[in-house]
């Protein structure tokens, strides 16, 4: 059975403390036992579940809400102090409780108590319960105190470890920062050196670039003359053509043969020599040379035809009749 003891003050005797004990099996809503004492006398009553339901119906309240209001009024620590008012009459042995709302109050319940014949026994049980409760609370308090001390020691230990971790972290960060600064300075130095080397290479390329362009552009007039001049094959073609023309002229313009009786072998050898003149490969002549040859070609052909006719007449004149029939 669970019980709760509280100290209350009656509205009729505000300076006299009374002690109210409420005990129940399962819950207050299933019924409870109420005991009231002033230290000399004791009164008690048993409230059933049916009576609780009737009180809730009389007040037009839900049963659950009514039970909550009873718990707040009878069990200490459940409601606000000074909100509820207790009334008791020793003559009528009627006990009632009311709830105050500003200027208005309404009755929560009323019970008819019976005076206990052996009040000392009731008071003794009440005192024993209070002492047991105090002892239990003290033991619980001591246990909580020890637990609090243990947690405090653990907290101090954790705090010490945490401070060590923070110190180690700060030292590690400082060391890593110093190493980072060293590496960063090395990288900066290397980048500066590479940048300087790159600038030197670019300046060297810019200085050597005009020197590379000058040999191609600064050619002497003699070199241009060499490139403008004709090759050996081109210059040799007019020379060979002139020699060929000169040889042809010499053949056609040579004096007539004065031998009156040439032998057959000489004539054949001469004709053979004339017919076996080496042939020259045609070569392309310059434009001016072609024009000169074209202008002189008719005159040359005319002279060649005249020379051929004279030579044929002279040959016929000097030849003998025997040669003609040979």
From Swiss-Prot:
Give me the ranges of the annotated region Interaction with LIG4: 180-211
Please tell me, according to the UniProt entry, what happens when changing residue 312 to A. In 9A mutant; abolished phosphorylation by PRKDC; does not affect ability to repair double-strand breaks (DSBs), possibly because of redundancy with NHEJ1/XLF phosphorylation sites
Q: Which Gene3D superfamilies match?
A: 1.20.5.370, DNA double-strand break repair and VJ recombination XRCC4, N-terminal
Q: In what ranges is there compositional bias, type Polar residues?
A: 307-326
Effect noted on mutating residue 254 to A: In 9A mutant; abolished phosphorylation by PRKDC; does not affect ability to repair double-strand breaks (DSBs), possibly because of redundancy with NHEJ1/XLF phosphorylation sites
Location of the region described as Interaction with IFFO1 in the Swiss-Prot/TrEMBL record: 1-212
Q: Which residues form a coiled coil?
A: 131-165, 185-209
Please give the InterPro entries that the UniProt record associates with this protein. Answer: DNA_repair_prot_XRCC4, XRCC4-like_C, XRCC4-like_N_sf, XRCC4_C, XRCC4_CC, XRCC4_N, XRCC4_N_sf
Q: Where is the composition biased (Basic and acidic residues)?
A: 206-226
Which stretches are transmembrane? none
Q: Where is this region: Disordered?
A: 203-326
Query: Keyword Glycoprotein: yes or no?
Result: no
Residues that bear Phosphothreonine? 231, 244, 315
**Where is the cross-link described as Glycyl lysine isopeptide (Lys-Gly) (interchain with G-Cter in ubiquitin)?**
290
Effect upon mutating residue 315 to A: In 9A mutant; abolished phosphorylation by PRKDC; does not affect ability to repair double-strand breaks (DSBs), possibly because of redundancy with NHEJ1/XLF phosphorylation sites
Consequence of gene disruption: Mice show growth defects, premature senescence, IR sensitivity, and inability to support V(D)J recombination. XRCC4 deficiency causes late embryonic lethality accompanied by defective lymphogenesis and defective neurogenesis manifested by extensive apoptotic death of newly generated postmitotic neuronal cells.
Per the UniProt entry, what are the Gene Ontology biological process annotations, in alphabetical order? central nervous system development; DN2 thymocyte differentiation; double-strand break repair; double-strand break repair via nonhomologous end joining; fibroblast proliferation; immunoglobulin V(D)J recombination; in utero embryonic development; isotype switching
Pfam families to which the protein is assigned, alphabetical: XRCC4 (PF06632), XRCC4_C (PF21925), XRCC4_CC (PF21924)
Motif, Nuclear localization signal: chain positions: 264-269
Q: Which controlled-vocabulary keywords does the entry list?
A: Chromosome, Coiled coil, Cytoplasm, DNA damage, DNA recombination, DNA repair, DNA-binding, Isopeptide bond, Nucleus, Phosphoprotein, Ubl conjugation
Entry keyword annotation includes Ribonucleoprotein: no
The family note in this entry says: Belongs to the XRCC4-XLF family. XRCC4 subfamily.
Provide the protein name: DNA repair protein XRCC4
Organism whose genome encodes this protein: Mus musculus (Mouse)
Lineage at the top is: Eukaryota, Metazoa, Chordata, Craniata, Vertebrata
């Amino acid at each position: 059975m669970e019980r709760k003891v509280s100290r209350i003050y009656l509205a009729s005797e505000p300076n006299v403390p009374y002690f109210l004990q409420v005990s129940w099996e399962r819950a207050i809503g299933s019924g409870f036992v109420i005991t009231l004492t002033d230290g000399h006398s004791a009164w008690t009553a048993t409230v059933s579940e049916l009576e609780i339901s009737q009180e809730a119906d009389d007040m037009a309240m839900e049963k659950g809400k009514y039970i909550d209001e009873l718990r707040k009024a009878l069990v200490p620590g459940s409601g606000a102090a000074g909100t509820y008012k207790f009334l008791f009459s020793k003559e009528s042995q009627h006990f009632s409780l009311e709830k105050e709302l500003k200027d208005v109050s309404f009755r929560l319940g009323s019970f008819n108590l019976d005076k206990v014949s052996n009040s000392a026994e009731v008071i003794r049980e009440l005192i024993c319960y209070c002492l047991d409760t105090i002892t239990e609370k003290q033991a619980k308090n001591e246990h909580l105190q020890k637990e609090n001390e243990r947690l405090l020691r653990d907290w101090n230990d954790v705090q010490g470890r945490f401070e060590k971790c923070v110190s180690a972290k700060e030292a590690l960060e400082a060391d890593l920062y110093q190493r980072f600064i060293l590496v960063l300075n090395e990288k900066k130095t290397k980048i500066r050196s590479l940048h300087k080397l790159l600038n030197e290479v670019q300046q060297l390329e810019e200085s050597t670039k005009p020197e590379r362009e000058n040999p191609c552009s600064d050619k002497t007039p003699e070199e241009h003359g060499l490139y403008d001049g004709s090759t050996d094959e081109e210059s040799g073609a007019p020379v060979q053509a002139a020699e060929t023309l000169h040889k042809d002229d010499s053949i056609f313009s040579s004096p007539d043969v004065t031998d009156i009786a040439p032998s057959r072998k000489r004539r054949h050898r001469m004709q053979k020599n004339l017919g076996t003149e080496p042939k020259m490969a045609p070569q392309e002549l310059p434009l001016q040379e072609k024009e000169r040859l074209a202008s002189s070609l008719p005159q040359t052909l005319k002279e060649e035809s005249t020379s051929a006719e004279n030579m044929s007449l002279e040959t016929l004149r000097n030849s003998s009749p025997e040669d003609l029939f040979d």
